[in-house]
Amino acid sequence: MADFEEIINTRRSIREYDAKEVEDEKIEKILKAGMQAPGSRLGAEPWEFLIIKNKETLAKIGEIKPRVTNAPVAILLIANIERSFYKLVWQQEMSAAAENMLLEAVNLGLGGLWNGVAPEEERMNAIGEIVGLPKDENLKPFCIITLGYPAEGWENKFMDKFEESRIHYETY
């Protein structure tokens, strides 16, 4: 297990993966990390997860989100708005879950990429159709996290993004 500061400082978007399969135990840990994210009210978190390993399905989604095509596994995060306590904050709740998942991936020696789906309705509908999501206004595909062992040259590594000029105190 890596040091938390190291995880934060080395997480980056991994777009190329080794062909090695991601172990189910690691996928489960990543899902558990996502479910530990804060929501608008305990027990009212909107997230649901769809694990995709089938190469044909990944290729179909890849026609819309090209980075999904060659990933060993993808997880579609689906918001079930009906479950969210404050209906207007579902995207924040889903974002918290997604980042927890990406951080846990680094902790487990994996790389991940957040592929945005929402809020573009056409893209949300097309991806929902590919995976057989029921046509329900309360079910919203939010993002797709691709996971895998980083390909050579794509390892998680420190990239200094700190810019003091972006920090303000008391007033802008």
Predicted regions: what they are:
Residues 1-172:
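Acidic, surface-exposed loops and disordered segments
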